[in-house]
Amino acid sequence: MRLAQPDMVSAAPTEVDRLVWPLADGADKSPLGVLSTTEPLLRLQRTQRVWEVPELDAQYAKAFLELWPLGSFLVIGHEPGQVLMLKAGPSSGDINTYQIQRFPGGVSLESSNLCMPDCPHLLAFLSASRDVLPRTLLLPTPTVGAGDNHSDPHRLGCIQVDTSGRVLSVVNQLYLETHGGWGTETPQQTEPETGQKYSLAPRKPTPHRVSWVEDPLRPEAHHTGQEVHHPGADAHSLGSEVHFSCPALEEEEVNNDCYKDEDEEGCEDMLTAHIRALARTRSSYVARQYRCLRARLISDSGNPYSPGDPATELLQDVRQLLTDLQNYLAKDPDVRAVFGNRGPSILREEDLGPAVEVALCRAVLEPLKPALWTKLRTLRAQELRRLRRRQIALRVGAGPEGQSPALRNRNRIHARLAHLHAACAPRRKVALLLAVCSDVYAGLGGGENKEPLGADAFLPALTEELIWSPHIGETQLDVEFLMELLDPGELRGEAGYYLTTWFGALYHIAHYQPDTGRAPQGLSSEARASLRQWHRRRTLHQQAQPTAQANQPFEEPWAIGDP
């Protein structure tokens, strides 16, 4: 069996084409995505003046990086001429330089399709996903206990706990070597045991970019490969020592856990009960909208005002109803009063919208979910049958499933896919989808000494997992559900980044050619056009550059005749 590879040559993206991380809730509210933890971001934020040395010359930066482990990096220069310098290989010439570009939506590497709010967010992502880099970034060293003696001259920064265990202090060794130690003596360099010092816990590699989704392609500099590292909580300093209270760090990490299950969040229970009561009160606006959607789901006719794909129209109607109800309820005084009585948790105005969304999914969408999925299965019946037939054909060509060494990881992935389908709220589905991506990357890692792989390996790996999935039809509907129901702000960044990857993997399976034994060598022109159209229609770029195509319905490539 031969699976298609994504195009490795990609255009330098325009500002409109970039997948931008949502900024509405601030940096501390960014979704965790495939990182599964806030540790990399927290470490980078607290050690920013360790790895960011604007006054350092490129020649000196290269000399330092040559002494450090693979994946070590520095950000040098002043805006707008900042560059990322990365040690990509063992030889002295393997120091790569990447221009950091700044846009109204954040920062991005040159030739990359992904934009993040700031440098720490971008580097945190690049510590797990190489994107256009040849390897992932190796983050600064983790916290060490009181009394630990580290004399390694290759250490990027030193973070220590005082004898009371209550304060962290950071000393930037790079700064001391460059500017002198203010009365401190630089220890004599000894031969480091880099293999032992930097035997860091392996991290799940993630892909570079889904370049085959983007607009017309142009050549790009070929940067590949990576290594991964997940750090602990740190602090930041340039030469002086900066102190942080350890308990505050722990609270921040706990509060940034974005992967909590819906059932674990009990603070919205009163709000859910209130909205459920409104849905049962026949005269209320919520009840009228609920009845309209229920009638739409059991009706045999489509939307007379939008003569496009029926399944896409249905999901657009669901999204429109949920958006209208969320806006209506967020302004309702009774809802705001219930929200204000949630308990001892800290209330913030920006938390009201997400709380109403979760409550709406529980009180309105969840009761209608069986009817919604029955309707979607009916509308997609022909396409789902073809997808299942192609899946069976690919299984035959792949051989017995038991031959796979990653069977345990595969069972975990299939269990997550089942939970993904059982979930109702779009945000919960996205969290589970990204968790599946992490599991796929874990299977790609293979071992501590194995070089992590990028998107060229991730797409076939994801496709293979879907070939053996017992839930592939439900997964197809879940992906389409998320592509239509997620807010535009949530579709920027990792959510849109990976949804298009899943779209591509499912497309490869659905269009597998049993006669030739090959998957399609890339997406068809129809699929590419659909994705570009979807991207313009469903992201906030539509507001920045409205086009005639932006208002057209998203025509899936399902209508292609079954060969």
Curated annotation (Swiss-Prot):
GO terms for molecular function: GTPase activator activity; guanyl-nucleotide exchange factor activity. PROSITE patterns: VPS9. Residues 181-208, 539-563 are annotated as: Disordered. GO terms for cellular component: actin cytoskeleton; cytoplasmic vesicle; ruffle. It comes from the Eukaryota. The keyword Magnesium does not apply. It is found in: Cell projection, Ruffle; Cytoplasmic vesicle. SMART domains: VPS9. Interacts with RAB5A, RAB22A and MUSK. This is Ras and Rab interactor-like protein.
